[in-house]
A protein has these predicted regions:
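Sparse recognition of residues in long alpha-helices and their boundaries
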Residues: 33-34, 54-55, 142
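A short helix-loop-beta-strand connector motif used in the catalytic cores of GNAT acetyltransferases and
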Residues: 44-56, 65
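Charged, low-complexity, helix/coiled-coil-prone segments
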Residues: 38-45, 66-72
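Conserved GNAT-fold acetyl-CoA-binding loop/helix
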Residues: 25-44
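Juxtamembrane/interface motifs at transmembrane-helix termini
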Residues: 36-40, 48-50, 84-86
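Secondary-structure transition/capping residues
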Residues: 28, 37, 50-54, 111
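Acyl-donor (CoA/ACP) binding surface of acyl/acetyltransferases
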Residues: 1-15, 19-25, 57-149
Length: 149
């Protein structure tokens, strides 16, 4: 596989982001699909925020989606991913999880993944990467990577 880049989102990513966030399959467990205005608002409030809550991920200059990477609590970073359907089942989410865990560890933090119970792929990746299920918060299942994993 080629190298994945994690980078700051840019205003010019709005159209590619819209194609992803307007897809019903992508948004199935998140929210109703976004229209252009909602996509632009999300980009402003989450991607262009300081510090960002999400970052773009690309391969060969093509935006594949975004990763979630922001403070969850004083000791942890929340991480996750939202990817174009053509990236599903190809190991992208697993590779991105490894990269984000590495970033969190370099910052002296551990990592947390939250998902709805129906997100079996997310749960599978969390478990495969040695995240421990720690309970539910606001209807979301919470997985935490033990320190030094």
């Amino acid at each position: 596989m080629k190298d994945l880049t994690i980078r700051r989102l840019r205003p010019s990513d709005a159209e590619a982001l819209y194609r992803i966030l307007s897809d019903r399959q992508v948004m199935r467990y998140l929210e109703p699909p976004y229209d252009r205005l909602q996509t632009e608002q999300f980009l402003r409030e989450a991607g262009l925020a300081e510090p960002p809550l999400v970052y773009g991920t690309e391969e060969d200059g093509r935006l594949l989606g975004y990763v979630i990477y922001h403070a969850y609590d004083p000791d942890s970073m929340e991480l996750g991913w939202v990817l174009s359907p053509d990236c599903w089942g190809k190991g992208y989410a697993s590779r991105l999880t490894d990269r984000l865990v590495e970033l969190a560890h370099r910052a002296g933090k551990t990592a947390v993944i939250e998902c709805v119970p129906e997100q079996t792929v997310t749960r599978h990746i969390a478990e495969k990467k040695c995240f421990a299920y720690v309970g539910r918060t606001d209807g979301l299942e919470v997985y935490r990577l033990p320190p030094n994993e």
